[in-house]
Amino acid sequence: MERISFGAFLSPLHPLGEDPGLSLWRDLELAEWLDQFGYEELWVGEHHSAGWGTISSPELFIATAAERTRRIRLGTGVVSLPYHHPFMVASRAVQLDHLTGGRFTLGVGAGSIPSDMHFLGIDPADTRRRTAESLDVIHRLLTGDEPVTRVTDWFELHDARLQLRPRRASGLPLAVSSAVSPFGMRLAGQYGAAPLSFGVPPRPGSSVDDLAAQWQHAVDSAAEHGRTIDRADWRVALSVHVADSREQALDDLVDGWMRYRNEYWALLGTPPVHSRTEARKALAELIDRRSTIVGSVDECIDAVRDVQEATGGFGRLLVNVLDWADREAMKRSFELFARFVAPRFNGSLDGVTASYGWVAEQARAQRAAAR
């Protein structure tokens, strides 16, 4: 299988009870940890209601995180296009491209929280049309030299062009999110953008195998529009927790996962669990079908390999940042993953392994010759 690189996806989703302002600073501290541990990307979401997701402007968060990190790439995960004028999205994206020294990726999507849409007077049935209209304009602004004029029922542009241009001649990296329907994957294929799949929803019958069909939608759309799309650019976001053993990992997670299931996903109609025993059983089922990756280092290596094979291959695995475990257990999980799981897939062990093997072979040959 092809190599995989690794990043993190920060919605964020913080359970009620903790000071929300302090949570923002803790999220910035997390960005520093990820940078130090060698994660290649951090994606930051946009939410405006429901209490758990409190980053309303991923661009502002990224501008701050860029000052506190050195290497990690930072992306909006995602800007909800129906909520914003497309010229402003494109203009701010290019500014971030410059402020981050070229470390920014513009991730876009249709939005997912009905209450956010209600606040803004947006019909949920209209979000896909708005997303497609907006992305067409954004793509033209970011890649073309001609002024853009476009009049719709929700935005207007007249002879619009960007003052700042992307830093690189190849343009500003662009990603499109996908959850369940083919819409996001087809849009990614249409523009040759990187698909960003939000893993597997916690509903009966869903499994990691569904992701393979998602990828095919992107391939088909790209072909229809005369473009190609590379699996190496496909991001897949999954929940991951590494501990010394599966039992320890479950102990770390079960209470936080139960709150997440019963409080956050309940808003979306997911049935609750009623005890820690029931929660452990439900969580174990998610692990067994690879919707969530939890366990020891070796178990997580096997699970990543299984997901890679089930999907047909992808380029980047994004670890969901969820407050299921306490702070220290979460930090240790990210560190264990970076030290012992990621190297099995990103090629960083190839040189030292080959060198050790060569020296060992030479030593065996010398001992044999001395007999």
UniProtKB/Swiss-Prot annotation:
UniProt lists the family membership as follows: Belongs to the bacterial luciferase oxidoreductase family.
Q: In which pathway does it act?
A: Antibiotic biosynthesis
Q: Which GO terms describe its biological process?
A: antibiotic biosynthetic process
Cited function: Involved in the biosynthesis of the antibiotic asukamycin. Catalyzes the epoxidation of 4-hydroxyprotoasukamycin to the final product, asukamycin. Can also convert some 4-hydroxyprotoasukamycin derivatives to their asukamycin derivatives, but cannot use protoasukamycin as substrate. Can also use NADPH, but catalytic efficiency is 20-fold higher with NADH.
Annotated protein name in UniProt: 4-hydroxyprotoasukamycin monooxygenase
This protein's encoding gene = asuE3
Show the Pfam families listed in the entry: Bac_luciferase
Tell me the superkingdom of the source.
Bacteria
Q: Which UniProt keywords apply?
A: Antibiotic biosynthesis, Flavoprotein, FMN, Monooxygenase, NAD, Oxidoreductase
First-level EC class: oxidoreductase
Q: Which residues form the signal peptide?
A: none
For this protein, the record's InterPro entries field holds:
Bact_Lucif_Oxidored (IPR050766), Luciferase-like_dom (IPR011251), Luciferase-like_sf (IPR036661)
